């Protein structure tokens, strides 16, 4: 029997009936549906609709549904999806209750609508997944920090316009990505803060027709408070869109990391050696080791952002309140959540196993005039305005290019032909160590500043991990040193 069949004389067209069902994807909301149903039962008991015994019987029956769904053999999802009668997860759970406790199972729907049920289920789903992804972000950030600590004072070129710019510590580069991940975690926290209100009691559109204490269900589900407007509560999917936009930000940051690793793994750079456990070969070229993981990460941003774009278009122009269009927001949500979860899990393990060729990185810092900024700063300390110092060092670079040498390879006479302010102390000012340390400002790549940043980031990632938990990646320790690092 349909949940709404009383008004209709004709049965649904079989093709349409199959097409409009959502159980094939909203089965993923079963834990949330059970939790929301338990909370609603508490409100019904307080309102005198259910006796304490009836409420307990419903709770026990709902527990049986949960136990079957989480069967050790993993058959739970197929058990739900194979049901031929239920049109959605709400109907499925009701059918299971009726099979267990008879007509009492039908009584649970008193004072509630599927419109508020799905709004509640989705808020619970997004909240739990946002917090789970925060744990993955914290775990990956923690590994980035551990790898940064291993790098010590090893340096690498930093790039602007994909051209060598200035040397930075490898740790400074790794910590840049940790900063991005903490911002991503913060966006998820903001998303949770705005969605954390309970729609139960909103009814189909105008509010429940029973005098329910909405605070009971809200408190039982750990929401901050009940929602304030029934029309908004049943039709709001802002939180889905905001969550997907936050996932897009995560994917964008992951894709930047993936792109750099893909480049740095080429023979032309030679800065990293890809872990074999996360690489594949070629069916035609025996010598190949391909960066499939990082290439797929780059591609995933398209799918995740595509989910956000799809939901944007689905919600555009919808009149108040609930419309069936909103059912279509679920698949993009589920798919993007799974893709982000899998991506972060693999990137954390990949980063742990990544082998840095610090000898190649360091060698790359010694050519390409990466100390030109330090040379200009040297002249500034001699009293020359920066614009003039910039011009003078530019001429020195041109002279070095013509001679085939770096700035330190120019003689003092050659340098003084460009400016009399050059002295013998110039050569100490443009060593790699001096070039790094001239950036001695908060957030700069000077060795002392990076050490301070590293210690601060250890505390910040620790706070996130303590709040959301550390994901067990099956690694011996996040600080394990790769013996291939050199």
Curated annotation (Swiss-Prot):
Can you state which reaction this protein catalyses?
2-(N(omega)-L-arginino)succinate = fumarate + L-arginine
User: EC number(s) per UniProt?
Assistant: 4.3.2.1
**Compartments, as annotated in UniProt:** Cytoplasm
This protein's GO cellular component annotations are: cytosol
Q: What InterPro entries does its record include? A: Arg_succ_lyase_C (IPR029419), Argininosuccinate_lyase (IPR009049), Fumarase/histidase_N (IPR024083), Fumarate_lyase_CS (IPR020557), Fumarate_lyase_fam (IPR000362), Fumarate_lyase_N (IPR022761), L-Aspartase-like (IPR008948)
The protein's UniProt keywords, in alphabetical order, are: Amino-acid biosynthesis, Arginine biosynthesis, Cytoplasm, Lyase
Q: Which molecular function terms from Gene Ontology are attached? A: argininosuccinate lyase activity
The question of whether Lyase is a record keyword is answered with yes
Q: Name one Pfam family in it.
A: Lyase_1
A GO biological-process term: L-arginine biosynthetic process
Say yes or no: keyword Ribosomal protein present: no
Gene3D superfamilies noted in UniProt: Fumarase/aspartase (C-terminal domain), Fumarase/aspartase (Central domain), Fumarase/aspartase (N-terminal domain)
Residue ranges annotated as transmembrane are none
Q: Which CDD domains match?
A: Argininosuccinate_lyase
Pathway in which this enzyme or protein is active? Amino-acid biosynthesis; L-arginine biosynthesis; L-arginine from L-ornithine and carbamoyl phosphate: step 3/3
Main location group: cytoplasm
HAMAP family listed in its UniProt record: Arg_succ_lyase
PANTHER family registered for this protein in UniProt: ARGININOSUCCINATE LYASE
Recorded family membership: Belongs to the lyase 1 family. Argininosuccinate lyase subfamily.
Return the protein name.
Argininosuccinate lyase
Source lineage: Bacteria, Pseudomonadati, Acidobacteriota, Terriglobia, Terriglobales
